[in-house]
């Protein structure tokens, strides 16, 4: 995915978002914004239903994008910024704990490179 244009990434992100919105039953219109952040992988504004993804992480692969979008979409679905039992239960239905650990490690490594 490293050679993709930003527009190509947006298409992939839209497909992932639409698929997870359907599977999670999120009826609200959810926007995604891609920007550079030094310390954040992704975050969401629950009130505006907007997910922000770090542009520096786009080339880590589609599985990472799926994780980031799913993670933030669960926050929007549950209307909470916290990682409670419901949050983890939903997340684990889609991505195994081992895969989550692997993805998070890759994200941390990339963010550390950005900071230095």
What are these regions (language model features)?
Residues 1-67, 76-116:
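Active-site-proximal or metal-binding-adjacent scaffold patches in catalytic folds
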Residues 72:
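Walker B catalytic acidic pair
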């Amino acid at each position: 995915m490293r050679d993709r244009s930003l527009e190509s990434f947006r298409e992939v992100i839209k497909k992932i978002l639409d698929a997870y919105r359907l599977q999670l039953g999120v009826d609200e219109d959810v926007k995604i914004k891609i920007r550079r952040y030094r310390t954040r992988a992704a975050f969401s504004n629950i009130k505006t239903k907007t997910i922000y993804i770090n542009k520096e992480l786009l080339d880590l692969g589609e599985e990472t994008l799926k994780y980031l979008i799913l993670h933030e979409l669960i926050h929007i679905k549950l209307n909470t910024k916290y990682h409670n039992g419901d949050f983890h239960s939903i997340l684990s239905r889609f991505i195994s704990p081992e895969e989550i650990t692997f993805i998070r490690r890759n994200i941390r490594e990339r963010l550390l490179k950005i900071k230095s």
